[in-house]
């Protein structure tokens, strides 16, 4: 393994450790020494790759989005979507995204904290949020599903409105998941059940594409 490969591997290890520490303990309660310990490297090595804690927060946030995109793609690939109409593909993709609430709840709260933290450090513009990426690039499963629906006629709204709904769907679903993650389990808003609430929200978003 070349020296460059070792450095790349070490940097990735630091970012993975940072994401875990920030998600479990919160950004403010996490010290660089905690990240170094989690990653099995020295604190000095962490600073070799990242100048500030804010740089680590940024890279950890970008790692989470990259992982989210890959998970979404895998879910999309595992399901036989080709025979389904576009609107049903939209529904499945949104519900797959909503599943993050159950498997990455702490990470979702980290993202919420990270956006505020990076904003205070004038770095919020550096979040190249891959979810969602540009609609017309058709890279994300949701964009592919919408474009399929436009082509097969199951998406009834205009293409311009479909593009707006694409961004609004991701942002509103993320907001709901973060809100639910911050809500006590005995709150009245949680009575319908977490999965039921998310499923109904995804159904509601899907219906907007049919109008």
Feature roles, as predicted:
Residues 100-126, 178-185:
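Amphipathic alpha-helical segments used for helix-helix packing
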